[in-house]
Regions:
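Short helix-capping segments at alpha-helix termini
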Residues: 50-53, 107-112, 271-278, 342, ...
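Radical SAM enzyme core and accessory elements
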Residues: 2-11, 76-85, 103, 109, ...
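Radical SAM [4Fe-4S] cluster-binding motif and immediate context
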Residues: 180-347, 352-354, 358-360, 364-367
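Structural recognition of alpha->loop->beta junctions
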Residues: 129-156, 298-306, 364-380
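Conserved beta-strand positions
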Residues: 11, 89, 116, 250-252, ...
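Histidine-centered beta-alpha loop that forms part of the nucleotide-sugar donor binding/catalytic region
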Residues: 14, 92, 117-120, 286, ...
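Flexible glycine/acidic-rich beta-alpha junction loops that bind and position SAM and/or redox cofactors
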Residues: 18-19, 121-127, 153-154, 210, ...
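Acidic, low-complexity intrinsically disordered segments
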Residues: 2-243
Length: 586
């Protein structure tokens, strides 16, 4: 009886290094990788179609390094035991590129074929006039570089790999695929089990119509909305429910700009109600989403429990400078109150380091947000010229010095000089931002707002634990967090020494014990605070300025009293008066 040949495809989503040079890995990871899910789904479809021929089986292995150790020796043995195979480093961001390079070197030394794709490769090839040095180093190693999206293109790469003839570069940036009927993102249950909350991810669409200068997505996925169908989304959900997975992160950069959002939400609502499944979703939207009729209401009905909002800043000059023209500070409160009414937790992204920012102005603005905007949580980021963004291209063209260490391009490190702050002042302002917003007083305020509006105080407690704890305890951004930090003394940046076992392990266990105590102490205090709020007989009557319904408030709120805010409001009044004049003239 004839036995089929085998091709082993290993998909690896790399992590990156911490400040001490160790790979960031957890017993249970935080956010799931949509790139890994997409590539796995595409590879499964290639396997089903037997694109390598009737006599070749494709075996798949998916590894997210944030929660799974990459054992180069074991994987190499498995690939060489097969008739052919390769490693693909998928969804690699700029901060993950140094780690990816180190992984690639290990596999190439062992004669394994390697390819790499992701936002750093695609972004730099899209925006820079010459090849990025890090990408060129990959190519010099014999690593195949893939730019663009893999739908409809992966099979060609696999067909080249099976005969050992990978091309140095596969560039499909000018051939972005439609998404209707494409292979669906999926990850095996054993991989999802390593993600806290057993959450998986999928993209309902790609592309964003806006032009934010700090964003890389529009220069890789384009500004045209490309969408999956309602049938596709239902199939993704059913496929995951069959694995016992009910929690989803919809990774669209801006779900509100998906032109089919209503059809998708209607289908999710239909499936949810018909099957009686407790589906829950996390989405990302812009600050104008509340202007879409029924958008927020249908999101809540579909099971959206958390909403990430690109707030970015409350200074109109900063927003305009970043080409974030869609953000109107006069819409912020109305939008956030709408999510509050729908009982959906809001998490705002806030960027620190715009040209006019100073440590004092940053703290002032955060206090204004605390008092006047009913947002639940904020996550802070350094303004970073990410490779692939317009900001990076502009600085590159001007010859402005940027930090050469790509590992720092994680939005959690200073990578370029600031006009008003020294590096130390900027870093201090960043720490102050976290400490100011997540003061005990304000955490209690957020809990009271949640209780008064029928929200989930327990969820506020859990997320406050993350956002208040990760920086001081684990020294990583909350979005890179997980449960129980794992370290291997041999998984360190090559230019740093491997620490001796007698020093590494006692220190690791001591640090882990201290961290456990600090986490427990923080959790106990937050639990006490949550119980205090939930047991307050007056909790439903709580009211403050942020929860006050929106009326004509521009004379009263500090949010509108800065010079740039006044200029913005004057401009808005002129526009409204001009529009009224046109109506009267008709």
């Amino acid at each position: 009886m004839k036995t089929n040949k085998s091709f082993l495809l290993v998909l690896i989503k790399p992590s990156h290094y911490d400040n001490d040079g160790y790979v960031i890995r957890w017993w249970r990871g935080g956010l799931p990788s949509n790139s890994l899910a997409c590539l796995y789904g595409i590879a499964m479809e290639c396997r089903e179609r037997r694109i390598l021929g009737a006599d070749f089986d494709i075996d798949l292995e998916a590894i997210d390094e944030t929660n799974w150790k990459v054992s180069v020796e074991d994987l190499t043995r498995s690939i060489k035991a097969a008739d052919a195979g390769m490693v693909m480093l998928v969804g690699v961001q700029s901060n993950q590129f140094p780690r990816s390079l180190d992984i690639a070197k290990q596999f190439r030394r062992r004669g394994v074929q390697v390819a790499i794709g992701g936002f750093h490769v695609s972004g730099t090839l899209s925006m820079l006039p010459e090849c990025d040095p890090a990408v060129q180093e990959m190519m010099d190693l014999g690593v195949s570089v893939f730019a663009g999206e893999a739908e409809g293109q992966l099979e060609g790469v696999l067909q080249d790999a099976v005969v050992g003839k990978l091309k140095p570069l596969y560039n499909f940036l000018g051939d972005l695929p439609h998404l209707e009927g494409q292979p669906l993102p999926i990850i095996p249950r054993e991989q999802i089990a390593r993600v806290a909350g057993h959450t998986t991810s999928f993209d309902a669409g790609r592309g964003c119509p806006f032009q934010c200068s700090f964003c890389t997505i529009i220069n890789v996925q384009g500004r045209k909305s490309r969408r999956r169908t309602a049938d596709d989304i239902e199939a993704v959900i059913r496929g995951n429910v069959a694995q016992g997975i009910y929690a989803f992160f919809i990774t669209d950069d801006n779900f509100a700009r998906n032109k089919d959002w209503e059809a998708l939400l209607d289908r999710i609502i239909e499936v949810r109600e018909k099957e009686q499944w407790g589906l829950s979703f996390t989405i990302q939207v812009d600050t104008l989403c509340h202007k879409l009729p029924n958008f927020i209401e249908k999101c809540a009905k579909a099971g959206v429990r958390r909403c990430f909002i690109g707030l970015e800043n409350i200074n109109p000059d900063s927003l305009l400078g970043a080409k974030k023209r869609q953000n109107k500070i006069t819409d912020y409160r109305e939008m956030m109150l709408a999510w509050k009414q729908a009982k959906v937790m809001t998490v705002g992204g806030y960027i620190l380091g715009f040209p006019n920012d100073t440590p004092a102005s940053i703290v002032h603005d955060i206090k204004v947000i605390q008092d006047e905007l009913p947002i639940d949580l904020l996550e802070f980021f350094f303004l970073t010229p990410l490779p692939g963004s317009e900001d990076h291209k502009t600085l590159y063209a001007k010859g402005v010095a940027m930090d050469p260490d790509l590992n720092k391009y994680d939005l959690d490190h200073v990578t370029v000089e600031h006009s008003n702050m020294s590096k130390a002042e900027w870093e201090c302002a960043y720490k102050l931002a976290w400490d100011t917003y997540y003061s005990w007083r304000h955490i209690e305020t957020v809990m009271r707002r949640s209780a008064a509006t029928g929200g989930n105080v327990g969820k506020i407690k859990t997320y406050a634990l993350y956002f208040k704890g990760y920086h001081p305890i684990e020294h990583v951004h909350p979005l890179e967090g997980g449960v129980l930090r794992l370290k291997d003394r041999h998984e360190r940046r090559p230019h740093l020494p491997v620490e001796p076992a007698w020093l590494f392990y006692p220190r690791y266990f001591a640090q882990t014990s201290v961290k456990a105590v600090r986490w427990a102490t923080l959790a106990i205090r937050l639990e006490w605070l949550a119980r205090k709020v939930k047991s307050d007989p007056q909790r439903l009557k709580y009211m403050d300025q942020a929860l006050t319904p929106v009326v004509n408030e521009v004379e009263n709120l500090e949010l509108y009293k800065t010079r740039s805010s006044q200029a913005f409001l004057d401009q808005r009044r002129h526009i409204e008066e001009a529009q009224k004049s046109k109506v009267v003239a008709r």
